[in-house]
Amino acid sequence: MSKEKFERTKPHVNVGTIGHVDHGKTTLTAAITTVLSKHYGGAARAFDQIDNAPEEKARGITINTSHVEYDTPTRHYAHVDCPGHADYVKNMITGAAQMDGAILVVAATDGPMPQTREHILLGRQVGVPYIIVFLNKCDMVDDEELLELVEMEVRELLSQYDFPGDDTPIIRGSALKALEGEAQWEEKILELANALDTYIPEPERAIDQPFLLPIEDVFSISGRGTVVTGRVERGIIRTGDEVEIVGIKETAKTTVTGVEMFRKLLDEGRAGENIGALLRGTKREEIERGQVLAKPGSITPHTDFESEVYVLSKEEGGRHTPFFKGYRPQFYFRTTDVTGTIELPEGVEMVMPGDNIKMTVSLIHPIAMDQGLRFAIREGGRTVGAGVVAKIIK
């Protein structure tokens, strides 16, 4: 029993495989679980168990994803693998599987291909912080110079999208041979695991980040003042803390004079908890759903941003027709809808259901946001798209 308890104290890190179709992402995923379970314990997963990915719904979007888990001596990894290219696009944009780092699989026999580039770009847009490269199928390439050339191409491609191409770990291996148990190739999987352990820093837990609470409801309690409720997204709020009310209106400062949960007064509210926060001197009409309470200076309100968007297909309950420039839907951030206008990239006249597209959005009210914030695009309460803030303009 004590061993089980010990395992749970290991840091949890979320990773995933990305890369071009048929370059060996799923085979590598199977090889990692197999080799690591042999060396460090845990469950091995066969290729076909991973390849028959179950359908999931994230924000109404159908995504096929496989989740596997494995351990190294120092960490516990949750790893996502998607069977199809469209699944990757949806997964990365909706943040259904947030990645602390990604393993980019490139077949040495092909070198970088169109989806290799697209996944790196998406990784940059949606805020995947670290990429490690697994150069696969190296057992099929005898020419050392060719391997060096492919490696150089991959490094250049990463640098093009602002990843540190020159410093990125590249492991040369063969997922298939490792899966078949050949010692020299198994060694490469252990090398990859070591790169994950050392190159991807331990993710900062939500509770250690600056306090943020999306406001869901506002009440006036006679004799006590104004209470806002919501689920603490990150950080800790303590009685007596000064906070800012950010978004929609001018940013205002106030002090939290009480934190309550299930009608009980507490000293603090923590990430993941549903709380009510009593605010000193704030009037009921000065605050509304859609704003956030945040640690002063930790987040700012913005109206204009670049985003990466996936437009739901008709089958997913999305639009049946394309939209054009001048489209004015609602953008749903955290707890509220804000109307916005869009600009499409040069040369793009229309966007079809099922497309993913880069678009510039201009909202009619500012919303508290930072890069990587997810949102939904809605028309009259119906979700027609999902997006992520890639870059703040103003």
Swiss-Prot record:
Subcellular compartments: Cytoplasm
Enzyme class: hydrolase
Entry keyword Ligase: no
A Pfam family recorded for this sequence: GTP_EFTU_D3
PROSITE patterns per the UniProt record, alphabetical: G_TR_1, G_TR_2
Record keywords: Cytoplasm, Elongation factor, GTP-binding, Hydrolase, Magnesium, Metal-binding, Nucleotide-binding, Protein biosynthesis
Alphabetized CDD domains for the sequence: EF_Tu, EFTU_II, EFTU_III
Catalytic activity: GTP + H2O = GDP + phosphate + H(+)
Domain tr-type G span(s) in chain numbering: 10-204
Main location: cytoplasm
UniProt EC number: 3.6.5.3
Region called G4, residue ranges: 136-139
GO CC field: cytosol
Stretches for region G2: 60-64
Superkingdom to which the source organism belongs: Bacteria
Positions bound to Mg(2+): T26
Entries under PANTHER family matching the protein: ELONGATION FACTOR TU, MITOCHONDRIAL, ELONGATION FACTOR TU-RELATED
HAMAP family: EF_Tu_B
Protein name as it appears in the record: Elongation factor Tu
Origin species: Mannheimia succiniciproducens (strain KCTC 0769BP / MBEL55E)
High-level lineage: Bacteria, Pseudomonadati, Pseudomonadota, Gammaproteobacteria, Pasteurellales
